[in-house]
Amino acid sequence: MLILTRKIGESLLIGDDVEITVLSIRGSQVKLGVKAPKEISVHREEIYQRIKVLADENPSE
C-alpha cells in the first residue's frame, strides 16, 4: 500500500485520468473530490460491496 501525505487543495493522480483532491479536513474526517471519466465508476467501499452482493444474488445481468 502506498501511503501519501497531502494538504488541503493538494491532489494525487491515478493513471492519466483520475485525480483525487483533498477538499477539507475536519477532525478525523477528510473530504475528497474525485475527477474521473464517466466510464470509470467511483464508489465508497461500503456501497461497492453492496453492489457486488446484489450482482452475486442476481447473476442474470
Curated annotation (Swiss-Prot):
Biological process (GO) annotations held by this record are: mRNA catabolic process; negative regulation of translational initiation; positive regulation of translational initiation; regulation of carbohydrate metabolic process
Gene3D superfamilies given in the database record: Translational regulator CsrA
Location (main, coarse): cytoplasm
- Show the SUPFAM superfamilies listed in the entry: CsrA-like
- InterPro entries the record matches: CsrA (IPR003751), CsrA_sf (IPR036107)
| Cysteine disulfide links | none
Q: Where in the cell is it found?
A: Cytoplasm
Where does it sit, as one GO cellular component term? Answer: cytosol
A GO molecular-function annotation = mRNA 5'-UTR binding
Recite the UniProt keywords alphabetically: Activator, Cytoplasm, Repressor, RNA-binding, Translation regulation
Q: Which family does it belong to?
A: Belongs to the CsrA/RsmA family.
Q: PANTHER family from the xrefs?
A: CARBON STORAGE REGULATOR
User: How the protein assembles, per its UniProt entry?
Assistant: Homodimer; the beta-strands of each monomer intercalate to form a hydrophobic core, while the alpha-helices form wings that extend away from the core.
Function recorded in the entry: A key translational regulator that binds mRNA to regulate translation initiation and/or mRNA stability. Mediates global changes in gene expression, shifting from rapid growth to stress survival by linking envelope stress, the stringent response and the catabolite repression systems. Usually binds in the 5'-UTR; binding at or near the Shine-Dalgarno sequence prevents ribosome-binding, repressing translation, binding elsewhere in the 5'-UTR can activate translation and/or stabilize the mRNA. Its function is antagonized by small RNA(s).
HAMAP family per the UniProt record, alphabetical: CsrA
Stated name of the protein: Translational regulator CsrA
- Species of the source: Glaesserella parasuis serovar 5 (strain SH0165)
Q: What taxonomic lineage is listed for the species of origin? A: Bacteria, Pseudomonadati, Pseudomonadota, Gammaproteobacteria, Pasteurellales
Q: Which gene encodes it?
A: csrA
